[in-house]
Amino acid sequence: MNYKLKTRSGWLDEYHQGVRYGLEGKLILEESSPFQKITIYESKRYGKALLLDDCWMTAEKSEKCYHECLIHPALCCSTRIDNILIIGGGDGGSARECLKYKEVKSIDLVEIDLRVIELSQKYLPTIGGNAWSDSRLNLQIKNGIDWVKHTKENSYDVIIIDGADPIGPSKELFSNSFLKDCKRILKPGGVLATQSESPESFQEIHINIVKILREIFDYADPMYGSVSIYPSGLWSWAFASMENPKYIYPKKSRVKEISENCQVWSERWQQGAFNTIPAFIERELAKI
């Protein structure tokens, strides 16, 4: 996955494998943290956007689909949602969605790069919203791999892996060893959720993520939707559980609690998204 970022007459373009995706606007900030290159860009169409290592990560007016689709299939379906672990998620969007549920008592958000949090709070405050001041959110500026490795068994009801593409500091978040550790610290009846790349632009990576999850968990399935600032626009999330698939059947009480506060996700949307599998991907998934 080799990315390049270029500017041209008021545009910022991400280049990858012969494809260019650009937004018109202006550059606000560009710096390097100890872990990655961070860019903040103000686009005319989607508002302020965050890029990591020259990849579009999130933008104010296009982030709802990504965050709602990563969080709610897991939290609406898990047996309990008292204790949540988020790996990554430094923009605050995943925490914001989790905190819509009154049942949630504690969220450990483990982000390796403090600058991602600081710059998101300063330049993209609407994404995290009130999550940053919620007493249920515990920020841990640490390595997520190490955090999971040293956490005791059955610690979390839901685990959310909200990492970037499998390059740089996020690469190991897709490894067999890390996901096995996630299974170990997930409580019975719990659900794991992860972003799982574009099935069109990164088909091999997407299939491999689902394959690893199915090797480790009894049940694992991808779900598909649209995220306009990502390569090809077609994106995926994968969900895993040790119980017959917990992530497909939302609890009615939770649906009622959060549905009016969602822009994309709904119970009907979730059911459709799990069944709307591109034919070429379905054939590949049948092989694993």
Swiss-Prot record:
Residue stretches making up the PABS domain: 9-242
Protein EC: 2.5.1.16
UniProt-recorded Gene Ontology molecular function terms: spermidine synthase activity
Role played: Catalyzes the irreversible transfer of a propylamine group from the amino donor S-adenosylmethioninamine (decarboxy-AdoMet) to putrescine (1,4-diaminobutane) to yield spermidine.
Assembly with partners or alone: Homodimer or homotetramer.
Protein's recorded name: Polyamine aminopropyltransferase
Main location: cytoplasm
Gene: speE
Transmembrane intervals: none
Keywords associated with the record: Cytoplasm, Polyamine biosynthesis, Spermidine biosynthesis, Transferase
Gene Ontology biological-process annotations: spermidine biosynthetic process
Compartments where found: Cytoplasm
HAMAP family the UniProt entry points to: Spermidine_synth
Entry's Gene Ontology cellular component terms: cytoplasm
UniProt-annotated catalytic positions: D162
Organism: Prochlorococcus marinus (strain NATL1A)
Pathway(s) this gene product operates in, as recorded in its UniProt entry: Amine and polyamine biosynthesis; spermidine biosynthesis; spermidine from putrescine: step 1/1
UniProt catalytic activity: S-adenosyl 3-(methylsulfanyl)propylamine + putrescine = S-methyl-5'-thioadenosine + spermidine + H(+)
Top enzyme category: transferase
Family: Belongs to the spermidine/spermine synthase family.
UniProt: spermidine binding residues: H67, D91
Residues that coordinate or bind S-methyl-5'-thioadenosine: Q36, E111, N143, G144, P169
